[in-house]
Amino acid sequence: DVLMFRDPVCSTYNFPRERVMFLPERNCNPFFHFIEGLWMLAGRRDVEPLARFVKRMKEFSDDGNFLYGSYGYRWRNQFGYDQLHDVVQKLKDNKWDRRIVLSMWDPVHDLHYKGKDVPCNTQIYFKAYPTKELGEENNQIKLDMTVCCRSNDLIWGAYGANAVHFSMLHEYI
């Protein structure tokens, strides 16, 4: 059964470095998600390194070799350039820039793709803000990261694997 929500669902991670959520319903290997996060940051899409840890990973590949919707590959290669490099550079150039968007959805290919692995998460927005303006006593600059999702499994995807992956991306940026 799929639980459907009429309105958008929003989750806030106040402690993103606490990457792993341990839920009795979800028996997972937290080290695998860490390895997968590094694999993403490297811009890979080959399934073999992940299949060494979780054999079922090949079931999500159309050809047994590559994951079509690999976020890391899309961050680093999909659109002909390294988006992560540009995100970091834009923040260095102007930390208050509100146009920093990391795309994972490729409308030219994904909208009509019939395969197994279409990205659930579509975009990520980055926004820096001064904490003093939010009532905090110290005046630090924090980086907010908002992940937009078209569809996701809350326990297995969002609160499981994606919490680890995106917290690593947040720290990398």
List the predicted regions and their residue ranges.
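Terminal, non-catalytic protein-protein interaction segments that mediate quaternary/complex assembly
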Residues: 1-173
